Amino acid sequence: MKVIFLKDVKGKGKKGETKNVADGYANNFLIKNGYAVEASNAALSTLSAQKKKEDKLAAEELAEAKALKEKMEKLTVELKAKSGEGGRLFGSITSKQIAQTLEKTHGIKIDKRKMDLPEAIRALGHTKVPVKLHHEVTATLDVHVSEE
């Protein structure tokens, strides 16, 4: 029997996949438990429409991320902090502070976890911070830390 998987089934198929399986397995396990539906013409057309919709949505997200990247790479986030001798900061600048300042000054809301800052900024000056906007798009944000 030909079925369309609604969920991932280990060893048999992934969500959205169409596959031939034994009749008993399809009726007694997959369809009964909601893991699959029988592959009729109506179900296949619904599946193709759903895939087109998902592809369109993914393309829109990618375009949005690319536009945001262009905008972000032109910006400089200005932060002020107290510092001692040699430009060393008292404390540090974290990705959370960068995200808050970015939202406050430029109106761009970015999750702090998307900023790839392995260690907090502990010195005055310019720092390039990579920001993962999409799994294919990474922007580089310029952060300038000046003395308070």
Swiss-Prot record:
Keywords: Ribonucleoprotein, Ribosomal protein, RNA-binding, rRNA-binding
Stored InterPro entries: Ribosomal_bL9 (IPR000244), Ribosomal_bL9/RNase_H1_N (IPR009027), Ribosomal_bL9_bac/chp (IPR020594), Ribosomal_bL9_C (IPR020069), Ribosomal_bL9_C_sf (IPR036791), Ribosomal_bL9_N (IPR020070), Ribosomal_bL9_N_sf (IPR036935)
Cellular component GO terms, alphabetical: ribonucleoprotein complex; ribosome
UniProt keyword Calcium present: no
Taxonomy, superkingdom: Bacteria
Biological process according to GO: translation
Signal sequence, start to end: none
Keyword match Ribonucleoprotein: yes
One Gene Ontology molecular-function label: structural constituent of ribosome
Role of this protein: Binds to the 23S rRNA.
Family per similarity comment: Belongs to the bacterial ribosomal protein bL9 family.
NCBIfam families, per database record: L9
Protein known as: Large ribosomal subunit protein bL9
Native source organism of the sequence: Listeria welshimeri serovar 6b (strain ATCC 35897 / DSM 20650 / CCUG 15529 / CIP 8149 / NCTC 11857 / SLCC 5334 / V8)
